[in-house]
From Swiss-Prot:
Subunit structure: Homodimer.
Presence of the UniProt keyword Cytoplasm in the record: yes
Catalytic reaction annotation: (S)-4-amino-5-oxopentanoate = 5-aminolevulinate
Modification N6-(pyridoxal phosphate)lysine occurs at: 271
Subcellular localization: Cytoplasm
Pathway involvement of the protein, from the record: Porphyrin-containing compound metabolism; protoporphyrin-IX biosynthesis; 5-aminolevulinate from L-glutamyl-tRNA(Glu): step 2/2
Name of the molecule in the record: Glutamate-1-semialdehyde 2,1-aminomutase
One Pfam match: Aminotran_3
Keyword Isomerase: yes
Main location: cytoplasm
């Protein structure tokens, strides 16, 4: 399908990038392969808006895939970064900023007794898995189809997100030996977890799950699912790892833990905690974290872990996220979900708007979506038409039907009105789309 609007400067940049970068991008979903057309190269962001290289402004409902919870270029975050940069960009030593950020995380997330800072969500989950194996002396890891935990080899099996976007069942380069200790189960199925423990007695080091998945679209845990995972892990000597890279500090002050109250053994964080910079963390029970080097035998390290600029940005952002901020984000999200649902209903488009706190996505099916298989049954071609209509009208959505939409405290009445104005035409485009 051809799209009538053009982005010549973005196209020129994409052509240049494609010569020197595989696929023209540094993260696959940015390439627009799932939706077609020219990926937009952004040059600036202010509040709820992005401006591309062609000078077009968009209401941003991606928020850098979650981190920009205060909107773009928040003055207090920018000031904190500028002050930190003025003192240097990296020292390779401990610094007060990393201590302060760790203290903030521990204060907000009650199950986290100690935390280790890293530079990406992938590093956080990779390190948490290694720590769980080292602590338990076991090898096997249970994960769920559709849950994405970064691009670490052992966790890419049935990983949702990028692999769902590109229709890949797995990825070349992950060996059978690497994936052999990974047990992949259907999401929201406690009986499958119980059966896995029975099939592998004394072998499972941990069960890892997105606290509330957002990488197959937003598919919240069924009532009692996370609590059931915790109980099964405790009964079988395994650790329960809650991946809050996406939900952490977004779905509440204490992330998804603040929503369901289930106490994990280990947790991973990223996105919001970095304030737009590469920063992430993993933490949890003190007795487990004590196994990390240099205190214990499980090795983990990183040259830029605890970077002073990243920790300054993250700390500034977290300190601005009070109860009022979350109330605002939740209200904006609820309003947008209602507007989207009304527009699609008016045009007779089968859909399900699924939310986890202020994260949400739209599945183009009217059937319940409880797991990865359900998510894949939607009419993705309708999302493609919807996406391009919104983009042409100045609303930037995730370029994939399998990703969460995000809002920020900066999404004001004007931004919401612009989204509302774009929805009728986008809903008609979805209704008229053909496979």
């Amino acid at each position: 399908m051809a799209y009538s609007y053009e982005a010549p400067v973005s196209q020129s940049l994409f052509d240049r990038a494609s010569v020197v970068t595989p696929g023209g991008v540094n993260s696959p979903v940015r390439a627009f392969r799932a939706v077609g057309g020219t990926p937009r190269f952004m040059v600036s962001g202010t509040g709820p808006y992005l401006t591309d290289a062609d000078g077009r402004e968009y209401v941003d409902l991606v928020c850098s895939w979650g981190p920009m919870i205060l909107g773009h270029s928040h003055p207090e975050v920018i000031a904190a970064v500028q002050e930190a940069v003025s003192r240097g960009t990296s020292f390779g030593t401990p610094g007060e900023g990393e201590v302060a950020l760790a203290e903030e995380i521990v204060a907000r997330i009650e199950p986290v007794e100690q935390v280790r800072l890293v530079s990406s969500g992938t590093e956080a989950t990779m390190s948490a898995i290694r720590l769980a194996r080292g602590f338990t002396g076991r090898a096997k890891v249970v994960k769920f189809a559709g849950c994405y935990h970064g691009h670490v080899d052992a966790l890419l099996a049935a990983a949702g997100s990028g692999v769902a976007t590109f229709g890949l069942p797995d990825t070349p380069g992950v060996t059978g030996a690497t994936a052999g200790d990974t047990v992949v189960l259907p999401y929201n199925d406690l009986e499958a977890v119980r059966a896995a423990f029975a099939a592998h007695p004394g072998e499972i080091a941990c069960v890892i799950t997105e606290a509330s998945p957002g990488n197959m679209g937003v598919v919240p845990p069924a009532d009692g699912f996370n609590a059931g995972l915790k109980e099964l892990c405790a009964a079988n000597g395994a650790l329960y790892i809650s991946d809050e890279v996406m939900t952490g500090f977004r779905t509440s002050k204490a992330g998804w833990y603040g929503v369901d109250g289930v106490r994990p053994d280990l947790m991973t964080f990223g996105k919001v905690m970095g304030g737009g910079f590469p920063a992430a963390a993993f933490g949890g029970r003190g007795d487990v974290m004590a196994h990390l080097a240099p205190a214990g035998p499980v090795y983990q390290a990183g040259t830029l872990s605890g970077n002073p600029v990243a920790t300054a940005a993250g700390l500034a952002q977290l300190r601005l996220l009070d109860d009022a901020a979350y109330a605002r984000i939740d209200a904006v999200s609820a309003g947008l979900r209602s507007l989207v649902g009304e527009a699609l209903t008016k045009e007779g488009v089968a859909h399900t708007v699924s939310a986890a706190s202020n994260m949400f996505s739209v599945f183009f099916t009217d059937r319940p979506v409880r797991d990865y298989e359900d998510a894949k049954q939607q009419d993705v071609f309708r999302f493609t038409a919807f996406f391009h209509s919104m983009l042409a009208q100045g609303v930037y959505l995730p370029p994939s039907a399998f990703e969460s939409w995000f809002v920020s405290t900066a999404h004001d009445e004007r931004a919401v009105e612009r989204v509302a104005a774009a929805l009728p035409a986008a809903a008609r485009a979805a209704a008229e789309a053909t496979a």
